[in-house]
């Protein structure tokens, strides 16, 4: 077998693989000998079929299998012997000439094929002790704990029927029928709907007009759907709702005591506070980690500059661009609304894709050199978390991860990345800084990359993809589930 390098340009490589016809014939004869004792042909006893007859009947199909095996197996063997790793699946090309293909299948001509690929660049790791990060720490106050407990308590708050007029904080139970231009619309009708006045769950103006109603009242409410309302047929439209009030109920007082804790399944208020404090600390800790991770990645980005495989960048850009267009479609906005053009957006996100690929390669190299491994237990836990996100679709999800090439890598990658970050945190300089909750949660423009400073609106569009790869926080984006009732869709 000959391996001839026909292209070496930057990260691009192209190899011509030549397997002599004599070698192909020897491989074919070996397979025919093996098949001789297995095939059953009328007129011949087992194992007594002449080789010539066997070759005539099965030679080409066996040779076709051999060709497929060689194309499937040889590229990885050759790259390994060259000390190279392909960034993406190598592209294989063979002759398209039918006569030449016939000669190859008959072992009359050398079998040649071409392997084109991009190599993963060699990365010379640098010392990590020059990386310095600030870890923001929030001390959880008693007020913060009590505030969170009150929110929990309010979600389980009880209500008692009242005879008077409804006020802010009261719960109104009602039937309603919504109309636009006098015609009822889908999602605008409900019976026994419960609404706490002042909660902001319904579209603007709806709740305000219920203040002062009593049980048994009938009232027509007039509102205007927001211009950015998710349902295009209702956006900006005036609507009326014929409301029948069935009950007005006042909220029972909420106190943080043992009785409340018992309602929540705990033995005491102290235990409740302990659990809530732990939850808050965990939430703050997650934000802190993301901000620290961002600092680490930004510094690694400055430390390592090298060409990235175009195939990986293209794939990463496609993922980001798909997310952007999905978000724009859901919001009904255009690039002009985001104060940019499609061309500018493509340029900015191409830079982001290159950064993400470069950092991914650096983290991978750091992890491999440090012996970072993802355990089977960690993979199973990640898979279980995926299954929990799609109730009722467990079988489909399992089949996807079992049968889709590369699917398991999507589970492994984030685990591996976090373990590499953990490793780096033991080697770099970390300075703790006590801050307030507001300071921790505030967007820090100075920590944004230059790419994102130029396009703050676009950052939101790809926030989900960006956070997953780089741990960079972005402002949460309000979205309304498509199936939510029309009166509620704009509120949560």
Swiss-Prot record:
GO molecular function: peptidyl-prolyl cis-trans isomerase activity; protein folding chaperone; ribosome binding
Protein name: Trigger factor
Enzyme class: isomerase
Domain free text: Consists of 3 domains; the N-terminus binds the ribosome, the middle domain has PPIase activity, while the C-terminus has intrinsic chaperone activity on its own.
EC number: 5.2.1.8
Subcellular location(s) per record: Cytoplasm
GO cellular component, one term: cytoplasm
Organism per entry: Agrobacterium fabrum (strain C58 / ATCC 33970)
Residue ranges, annotated region (Disordered): 77-96, 439-492
Similarity comment: family membership: Belongs to the FKBP-type PPIase family. Tig subfamily.
Catalytic activity: [protein]-peptidylproline (omega=180) = [protein]-peptidylproline (omega=0)
Pfam family, one: Trigger_N
PANTHER family: TRIGGER FACTOR CHAPERONE AND PEPTIDYL-PROLYL CIS/TRANS ISOMERASE, TRIGGER FACTOR-LIKE PROTEIN TIG, CHLOROPLASTIC
InterPro entries listed in its UniProt record: PPIase_dom_sf, PPIase_FKBP_dom, Trig_fac, Trigger_fac_C, Trigger_fac_C_sf, Trigger_fac_ribosome-bd_bac, Trigger_fac_ribosome-bd_sf, Trigger_fact/SurA_dom_sf
Keywords: Cell cycle, Cell division, Chaperone, Cytoplasm, Isomerase, Rotamase
Residue intervals of the PPIase FKBP-type domain: 169-254
Major location category of this protein: cytoplasm
Protein's job: Involved in protein export. Acts as a chaperone by maintaining the newly synthesized protein in an open conformation. Functions as a peptidyl-prolyl cis-trans isomerase.
Gene3D superfamilies assigned: 3.10.50.40, Trigger factor ribosome-binding domain (3.30.70.1050), Trigger factor, C-terminal domain (1.10.3120.10)
Gene Ontology biological-process entries: 'de novo' cotranslational protein folding; cell division; chaperone-mediated protein folding; protein transport; protein unfolding
